[in-house]
Amino acid sequence: MVQHELAAEIARQILLGFDDYREHFRLITEGARARFEQAQWQEAQRASAARISLYEEKVGETRRRLLASFDHADLLQVEAWPQIKSAYIELINPRFDDELSETWYNSIFCGLFSHDCISDGTMFIHTTRPAVRAHERLAQTRRYRPNGDLRGMLEQILRDYAFSVPYCDLPGDLQRLQTQLCETLPDWVCKDPELTVEVFVSVLYRNKGAYLIGRIFTCDEQWPLAIPLLHRDGQGIVADALITDEAEVSIIFSFTRSYFMVEVPIPAEFVGFLKRILPGKHIAELYSSIGFYKHGKSEFYRALIDHLANTDDRFVMAPGVRGMVMTVFTLPGFNTVFKLIKDRFSPIKSVNRANVIEKYRLVKSVDRVGRMADTQEFADFRFPKAKFEPECLAELLEVAPSTVEVQGDTVLVRHCWTERRMTPLNLYLENASEQQVREALEDYGLAIKQLAAANIFPGDMLLKNFGVTRHGRVVFYDYDEISFLTEVNFRHIPPPRYPEDEMASEPWYSVGPNDVFPEEFPRFLFADLGQRRLFASLHGELYDADYWKGLQDAIRQGKVIDVFPYRRKADRN
């Protein structure tokens, strides 16, 4: 058994690594304000990617330092880790980010030991943190009362959150915000003498936007509040909208968006605040939305094992067309799919396992523009065999035997990704009304365009590779063929040399590995002729190679597009 002093020193070194990670995380996040004020959009993209990769970098550094600092016979003695865990708990008890430090400890442990060594005695499978914290702390929100003057209250809010760059048209912004506030809330609310607006003290930054997040409440009711702010380069700051609809605010925090940059000294308190105004959001998703995606993964896992322990739910194959590269299963009562790489791919697929892993990891670091589902990667999941429907387990063992193994009463899944479950677009269209079909196809085209403008080409754009969220948004979720748009060679189909060319089974022109012919999209994407014609009327430019080349030129010139995670009331330039 490791001596108490040695256990305490190992725990201290683990926490020092966490402090180093948190400091670098804070510095990157803190720079978001200056990047917004200076309209440094490409720098913002680089900072976002750097912050995502920071966690694994710092875990690796800490692991190497531990291995260099301690005798391996002591450090790698798994029986000693309950004592190390106890020493660590004592160290993190006074912290404001204690729940994150538990996840950090877990990452270090998993970097030193195989998953066979995982237990609640050696790791924080279940949190030891109290639901209610007793820390004394500074207020995390600011409160405002209109006292009959809504415009004056809104002006005070905007002035309290002013930037080094002035507002472009403050009177116009105030008029717009007041109008939207009165239009979206019941008449009596704006006249209620108890009306209060509470705004989180830190501004949230993402891509080209900044957001004030809070709530509006009376004695009996509350509404979420989001005020998006834009920086029009050369013009100033614009308060673009005032949003109180829960579904719309929820979309701003969607699993399809990049992570916010926001200074949160007490993460649990901010997440609790978000949970109060967005009760439909899971804690895991909220932690991920503000950049703590590893802790989001911890919260997801805890929710999953709790669901399995307390329900009769059993794993089944996910609905939809079977994939050529991935196999997908799900729990009907748990809004998630589990994706495994098959042992053998369809012959028409030119990717390999390493390519697929690379593509899925790429999605984590790029701007998803609200059109790609976030993923979490897991290794060595263990589930009770009784939790699988026999048909599901049989199919998994058939198509992914190197990944799925039955060990007695347990099923070992060596590697998988989790994603939010959505309705596959092809299945959605089968049961949709005429209006729903039109709206879905319009959003499908917008999804492709917005991904392309963010330098992402989906590769396989078949309807089955897109899903429809509970808010009706179309989202791409099959990443094995994605690439950067600038890597693709878009071409027009050359005219046939002879009339017989058009009847031949093989093309009369050469095709390179990165060549894409948009004129071929209609027959590949739509078997339904009505849908094919409708999509052509909505997004016909997607069939033109010159459209794609124009996007490539804009990207190479360093242009960063505006993609708004909310409905804009009017177009304001």
From Swiss-Prot:
ATP binds at residues 318-324, 339. Keywords: ATP-binding, Cytoplasm, Glyoxylate bypass, Hydrolase, Kinase, Nucleotide-binding, Protein phosphatase, Serine/threonine-protein kinase, Transferase, Tricarboxylic acid cycle. GO terms for cellular component: cytoplasm. It catalyses: L-seryl-[isocitrate dehydrogenase] + ATP = O-phospho-L-seryl-[isocitrate dehydrogenase] + ADP + H(+). The active site is at residue 374. This is Isocitrate dehydrogenase kinase/phosphatase. Its EC number is 2.7.11.5, 3.1.3.-. GO terms for biological process: glucose metabolic process; glyoxylate cycle; tricarboxylic acid cycle. It comes from Stutzerimonas stutzeri (strain A1501) (Pseudomonas stutzeri). Disulfide bonds: none annotated. One of its GO terms (molecular function) is ATP binding. It is found in: Cytoplasm. The keyword Hydrolase applies. HAMAP family: AceK. Belongs to the AceK family. The keyword Cytoplasm applies. Pfam families: AceK_kinase, AceK_regulatory. Transmembrane segments: none annotated. NCBIfam families: PRK02946.1. InterPro entries: AceK_kinase, AceK_regulatory, Isocitrate_DH_AceK. It comes from the Bacteria. Its main location: cytoplasm. Bifunctional enzyme which can phosphorylate or dephosphorylate isocitrate dehydrogenase (IDH) on a specific serine residue. This is a regulatory mechanism which enables bacteria to bypass the Krebs cycle via the glyoxylate shunt in response to the source of carbon. When bacteria are grown on glucose, IDH is fully active and unphosphorylated, but when grown on acetate or ethanol, the activity of IDH declines drastically concomitant with its phosphorylation.
